[in-house]
Amino acid sequence: VTRTAREVVELYNLVVWNQRNFELADELMGDNVIRHEVGEATTLTHEQAVARIVDHWEMFNTIRFDLNLVVAGDDGEHVAIVYQSPMELKDGTRTDVGSMEIFRVVDGRITEVWNCGYKQGVWE
């Protein structure tokens, strides 16, 4: 059974990231993942997309993604999130960042992510 785009994005944030489930990351990431930013796009192979998650986790003692808002598009492929992310770095520094991302999910796998960056602080 193929998961809905919303289910994939929620699993990616709440299970892959929040529970360090890298096996699920392997299942949810596409053959290639295009990460869009303003002015540039980076295409990651499947292996690079999974390694990016593992490598990011190595910088933190804890990191959590709280999804303040999840909006699934009518096309069945796009999902937008507003998130808050409390984290603790390896040196014990604690901080919060917030941002928005839009995901494209095809056949149950994340194939594209749009992110214009994050900002330190908490959503008001």
Question: Where are the language model's segments positioned?
Answer:
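C-terminal and inter-domain tail/linker signature
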Residues: 1-124
